[in-house]
Amino acid sequence: MAHQPRWTMSQVTELFNKPLIDLLFEAQQIHRQHFDPRQVQVSTLLSIKTGACPEDCKYCPQSARYKTGLEAERLMEVEQVLESARQAKNAGSTRFCMGAAWKNPNDRDMPYLEQMVKGVKALGLESCMTLGTLTDSQAQRLAEAGLDYYNHNLDTSPEFYGNIITTRTYQERLDTLDKVRDAGIKVCSGGIVGLGESVKDRAGLLLQLANLPTPPESVPINMLVKVKGTPLADNDDVDAFDFIRTIAIARIMMPTSYVRLSAGREQMNEQTQAMCFMAGANSIFYGCKLLTTPNPEEDKDLQLFRKLGINPQQTAVLEGDNEQQQRLEQALLTPDTEEYYNAAAL
């Protein structure tokens, strides 16, 4: 792989100061050079272990330190996870992500996690996990099980990070990304807009991500979901244009990465989401629950896709657009009655 040129803070700052209309044009041009602008990759996120997390991430309702009304749950049984994966596939998802609310997995959990990965892969889905800090051996075991992606967000800039989290250092996050990459697993890493950070901090986050030895294959950009009981519950709302600008700059700086709309889509209207797609977003989380917060209902996503002329990216088993659209529509006629998408924010 050719060496990636490193971005400088002055270059990123220049992008943040660029007129939005010009920025969107540049981002869309770059997007079309590397992706089909009418295709969006669809992922489903499941919380395989919910609540009682010992970390103090100020945005997260899963932290045991905050009273958010969330009930803790043990690690799910493997077959429960695989049944959720089957339903996700039937609803049109091509990637199944599994998140656990803890600082790091215990070695006793690894056999179950490996079985989950193998089972998801056997269904023809891409697999992704977000489990916190990993050791070298844990990363290798997940790789040998066939894990495609590992999510571990940087959240914000190194300078602002200490205002949000104190139980895990920024360097720990970078080290985990290195271990995942060394094990041969693709990297999923992004951050959150709306933590109280400055524009310079948003630039710093994207600078860190784009200047990794190999940029993440997948970059989730979250809009803060303010949950009562967390320290950030009263933060100011994120301006939609500021969020769209962040998406566009992520696309420009990481032209071959999937840029994913993650937490916060529920509070975005159709116009904001449409502009995010125009800015270069080409992946979404799809399902009933994201984090322990709402995600747009599947039928609303399908309606928006139709309005914009967007098609969900095809599954691993090749099929025509019409066939996939019909299958997706049929799945949406039977709304999900189990809250198995009660997942941790990525």
UniProtKB/Swiss-Prot annotation:
The keyword Iron applies. GO terms for biological process: biotin biosynthetic process. It catalyses: (4R,5S)-dethiobiotin + (sulfur carrier)-SH + 2 reduced [2Fe-2S]-[ferredoxin] + 2 S-adenosyl-L-methionine = (sulfur carrier)-H + biotin + 2 5'-deoxyadenosine + 2 L-methionine + 2 oxidized [2Fe-2S]-[ferredoxin]. GO terms for molecular function: 2 iron, 2 sulfur cluster binding; 4 iron, 4 sulfur cluster binding; biotin synthase activity; iron ion binding. [4Fe-4S] cluster binds at C53, C57, C60. Its EC number is 2.8.1.6. Keywords: 2Fe-2S, 4Fe-4S, Biotin biosynthesis, Iron, Iron-sulfur, Metal-binding, S-adenosyl-L-methionine, Transferase. Homodimer. HAMAP family: BioB. Belongs to the radical SAM superfamily. Biotin synthase family. NCBIfam families: bioB. This is Biotin synthase. It comes from Klebsiella pneumoniae subsp. pneumoniae (strain ATCC 700721 / MGH 78578).
